[in-house]
Amino acid sequence: MGNEGMNRRALLSGGLAGALTLGAPLWAAAPFASRRIAVNVRGTGRDVVLIPGLASGPGIWNGVLAALPTYRFHLIHVRGFAGLSADANASGPLVQPVADEIARYVGAAKLSRPAIVGHSMGGTLAMLLGLKAAASRIMVVDMLPAGAAMVGGTASGLGFLADQLGGYLTGTLAGRRYLAQMVAQTPGAKGSDPEVIANALRDLANIDLGPQLPRLAAPLEVVYAVGADAAQASAITSRFRADYAGKKGTLLKAIGPSGHMVMADQPTRFNAALGDFLKGI
C-alpha cells in the first residue's frame, strides 16, 4: 500500500483528524452510571448500539440518526473523548475495560443482543462485544482486526513501539505538549484528554483479533474507505479481505472516494449500507 494510503490510515493522525463533531442531537440520557462510558438513547424501535472511534463523540452519528429514524439508538461516549471527563479512563488500559463496560450496559438495559456498529476503535470494541456474544450482528467501519495493521504493522512488531510512544506522549513534557497541540488543532478532538488518547493508541497497537475471528458467531459486515486512486483502492481491498478471512461469511463493502470518516465523507452511501445492514435485526 502506498505512503498516501498508509498516512490516511494512521491511527493517530487519521483517527484524530476524522473525529468530527457534527452538531449535538437531542437525546435522552440512559439511566446507567459508569466511570468509563456515558450512554444516550435516541428514538424507538429495534436496538442498535453506536460506538464512535478514537477521540470522537457520539456526534459523528448525527447523520445516521436523521437518516434512519425507526431504530432505538444507544450512543456510546467514551470518557476522556470529545469533552467528557476521563474519570476511570484517566490511566491504565482502556479498550478492554470499555468493552466490558459496554457489555455491562447491554445487560443493565436489558437489550436482547442488539446490532452493534463501531467506527475505527469502535469497530474493535464491537468485535470484542461480539466475542462476548452480546450482539445479534456487527458492523465494523474502517478498522482491521489488528489495530497495528492500519498503519502497516503487526501487534507484535508495533506493540513495543506503541508502548514507547505512549510513554513519550504521556510521560514527558514535550510529548504531552505535542499530543495536546494535535488535539487542539483537530476538529472534533477538542476536549479529548491526551493521556486517554495515548492509552487507547497503545492498546490498539497491541490488539490483534484476527486469530479470534472464527469464534465470532454473529454476522459481520465491514465497511471500509477507499480513495480515488484505483491501485491503492485495490491494495486496501486485498488487505481487508485477507485480514477478515478468518470469519466465514464476512460481508465487505468499499465506499469511496472517502477518508477514514466514511459517514461524513459519503453520508448517503454509508447510510444506505447501514440501513441494509439493520434490516437483518
What are these regions (language model features)?
Residues 74-114:
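Active-site loop/oxyanion-hole signature of alpha/beta-hydrolase fold enzymes
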Residues 3-13, 17-31:
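N-terminal twin-arginine translocation
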Residues 258-266:
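Catalytic histidine-centered segment of alpha/beta-hydrolase-like enzymes
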Residues 138-167:
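Flexible "cap/lid" loop of the alpha/beta hydrolase fold
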Residues 185-212, 227-229:
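Hydrophobic, aromatic-rich cap/lid helix
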Residues 41-85:
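Conserved HGGG/HGGXW glycine-rich cap/lid loop of the alpha/beta-hydrolase fold
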Residues 224-258:
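Conserved loop-alpha-helix segment in the C-terminal half of the alpha/beta-hydrolase fold
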Residues 114-149:
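Conserved hydrolase catalytic core segment
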